[in-house]
Amino acid sequence: MLYIGNHTSSSKGYAAMGRQIVKNGGNTFAFFTRNPRGGNAKAIDPADVAKFQEIAREHEFGKIVAHAPYTLNACAAKENLRDFARNTFLDDLKRMEATPGNYYNFHPGSHVGQGIEVGIQKIAEVLNAVLTEEQTTTVLLETMAGKGSEVGSHFQELRAIMDLVEKRDKLGICLDTCHVWDLSLIHISEPTR
């Protein structure tokens, strides 16, 4: 089965997202777990989640994709920023268990002059601190466009992170085609005549 959807606003809750996606002709969606620029997440309403799960069953939804806030930087040079990343991860992964078995996508981070190897190590450290055996959510490392000191713009960097993660079965990759296009990893030529 083909699963298709779009990024949608979570401001009105899970059931509203599900209804909007059905209206759009989709059967999955992505959403931010909280304001994409950071901040606290809204409380999850169990009745809202139950309504969403009915919609998802009725319309044969695929897995949904929660997106971490853009401000999450797992390899920041400043410890307080890495603490924010770890705490946000922990909170979001706990909240994701309200809708078990889905995806949590995040931008790996920017090493900000520390070097790619240090960035990779710090990202793996955060992942090792937050991933648990009990969680049902798969965490996705998103491919990046290579702007500034972003980590994850090359597949080798993502692989290096994954190689350092202990609970590898809780981890995957989100191939952001816009990002890899921007980095020129995708080459499309005109068909020959």
Map each language-model feature to its residues.
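Conserved functional loop/turn residues at catalytic and ligand-binding sites
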Residues: 25, 100, 192
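Residue-level detector of conserved catalytic or cofactor/ligand-binding positions
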Residues: 184-192
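Short hydrophobic beta-strand that contains or immediately precedes a catalytic carboxylate
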Residues: 65, 173-175
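Active-site beta-loop-alpha junctions enriched in small/polar residues
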Residues: 7-11, 34-36, 68-71, 109-111, ...
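Active-site acidic/histidine proton-transfer and metal-coordination neighborhood
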Residues: 74-172
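N-terminal pre-domain/capping segments
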Residues: 1-66, 72, 76-94
